[in-house]
Amino acid sequence: MKYSFIRYAADNFAEVFYITKIKKKMVNLFQYNTRRLFIFINRKIITFLFTLLIIPCFFSCDSSNYNQQISVDGLQEPVEILRDQWGINHIYAKNQHDLFFAQGYAAAKDRLFQFEIWRRQATGTVAEILGEKELKRDIGTRLFKFRGDLTQELNHYHEDGVEIITAYTNGVNAYIEEVLGTPDQLPIEFKLLNIVPEKWTPDVVISRHQGLLGNIGEELRIGRAVAKLGVKTVKDLSWFHPKDPDINLDPSIDKDLLFDDILELYNAYRKVVRFQDSDIQPEYRTSENVNALLVLNEGKDDPFSIGSNNWVVSGALMADGNTYMANDPHRTIAVPSLRYMTHLVAPGWNVIGGGEPEIPGVSIGHNEYGSWGLTVFRTDGEDMYIYNLNPNNSNQYKYNGEWVNMTIISETIKVKGKDDISVDLKYTKHGPVTYVDKVHNIAYAIRCAWLEPGGSPYLASLRMDQSKTWEEFREACNYSHIPGENMIWADKEGNIGWQAVGIAPIRTNFSGLVPVPGDGRYEWDGYLPINEKPNTLNPPEGFFATANQNVTPNDYKRWNAIGFSWSDPYRGDRVNEVLGSAKKITMDDMKALQVDYLSIPARILIPLLDGLSFAGKSAEAKNKLNGWDYKLEPNSIEAAIYVAFENQIRLLANHKFIPETGKDFITSIQMKKLLDWIITPDDRFGSNPILGRDQFLSKAFNKGIKYLEETLGDDLNNWQYGQEKFKHTYMAHALGKFVNEETKAKLDIGPLPRGGNAYTPGSTGGNNRQSSGASFRMIVNTGNWDDAVSTNGPGQSGNPESPFYSNLFEPWAKDQYFPVYYSRIKIDSVTVNKTLLNPKK
């Protein structure tokens, strides 16, 4: 007899546990016959009910059932890891410690090179392997290191945070010890760079270096743009909403000094690791002369191209009557995938989904009660402060009329091929000092809400992973500080909800969109309690969707604690359009919406061509658009014509409307702003706005057609969207460009055709080669957990030798899904490898 799960849950004065029995059927299928036994026992009398009431037969009594058994130092009891055919590890442990130990072990085994680079980024030790070119990064990393109480920090993310995170890093280290015993088993990247992995500590897990942290780069760009162009012009070219922010620079700020490299250390800390051919061992190096650099992990996304979609739908709109959750976070398309999927099962835990590879838990997924997902909710958690320094002591700054000493911390950094370098890290009361102008006695520091306890991105998902109700989920959301997110929830009781999260400074007398003096006049008035951020439960529409656009209700009162800059609304508009008109929605409908390529901008722009005259190839192309459905599908000629047209509109608009002196600071105009101008033209198009607008569109269309002719030839039939020359995906490994062809073939993946663009729900940003979008997607049916589906391209593993390195690339590129099984019987049916981890005796 097998028991599917034993749940131990401690409530305030009671222990509640649910026992679910599996009954065998004649055709070797199992149905759940669930009985809930509620036993209420005063916690003051019994503080601990059981360690194992019944050992669930997750563990086979026959050792021959396992592909391998491994003895691991640090485990308390055996742990079973079942790997399914898509590469997901289903981890079954008998206690919480072993569960997260095994998660760390398995994740490190799959992503060891990614883990080692992450560790070096997190600890400021990249220069130790890549030399002096990475010194600024290491200084920045140490400057922005969390230096608060570690126990308080770890327990912020979960009441057992110290145990969970320490167990996770010990699991990582157990695998590192194991593989160092057989170094020939190290992934090839270690051989290419001639390095070995080193041990982790909890400090690595809580690093903030690659989180979506705030807007400090935008803040400085706006400040510089105001200095060059003035407030009126900057506001005209920007799309600030829903309120009108004050972006005036304080009169005491010397505008000319804003153009120094103020954020050099911050940007170095935040940027991805860049390799050069000289980093590669000679025997693997390409013979070509390579000057270009490639990146590892995630590129620096444009603030408004970072996107995601999620939505929850009530059972009233679904054909089967169940609530559903769908989520597809959009980030840089990379190898390995930015998300890592896992299934964690132990007393008190049964959660499955995707998360950041380097942290414990699951950030997008479901447990046996509900499902949740996330998108970015614009929250400004950073500000730049400018200080006057004491001419007689550059380590003192003026604050509230007095000279105040900076805090100084000395660090020593190892640099490959050089002597160790000592640096002094300086801090004001607001935060790290990133730049000192010694000539003008000016210093700049960044106040970062994410340096408060709880600033590690996504790690508070640990609390969400055990939520049983909407109320418990909202309580867990209170601990989710970074990034600002739209958290959605759907549960099997029929509830759907939305809660915006993220640590949000309250600014009472400034907007946070431009630098301010650090003299005491511009201070934060605490932080907005997260449960006071916008939220809703069971909206009357029967669904709720977010796509990084502003979804804050108009009657919301706390505008001084949320952002003024949001993504274009078109992805969200399309999702709302489909869900708002649908009845009896199915899982197939949900899949189709996640990869929907209908372009609302196309639906706006193409009809405006009707009254315009064209000749030659442009006329032929315009006629081709008659009756088009506005979908940017692969192999579509119409899609190719439109995208070439749209690209030229943006290029011409940037050239025409952004003054030359501001082009370095305002690099583009948001599509929503631009389309508003085009729909209702004014004198920016000339004395006859409609004629000027039409001439602008004609020029853009002709230039788009010329581009297609030059790129794809004269034959219109060859102008197909979704090909290597025009919209494809190619996942280039960070080292691929610098190695010989044999090695490169192992590392790089692709190309394959893609559809869509940055403004379609099926988002594929990045012009001709997709560079951003949803490499991970998940849809959950709360009435049947085994009905969940997902995709995670290019694969679960980061090891090029693994069969799970690129097995999901083609299905992902073709917008296909695989099942994410939850029940043991279903998981057993697709298991391809069974590992038993035993405590080392």
Each language-model region and where it sits:
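N-terminal secretory signal peptides that target proteins for export/translocation
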Residues: 1-42
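C-terminal motif of bacterial Sec signal peptides marking the signal peptidase cleavage site
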Residues: 58-60
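Substrate-recognition/specificity elements adjacent to catalytic centers across diverse enzyme folds
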Residues: 65-324, 329-332
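Second-shell loop/turn segments in exported
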Residues: 100-102, 149-162, 447, 458-464, ...
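Hydrophobic alpha-helical segments
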Residues: 382, 442, 482-582, 649
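Terminal end segments
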Residues: 561, 565-618, 703-841
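Charged, long alpha-helical assembly modules
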Residues: 645-725
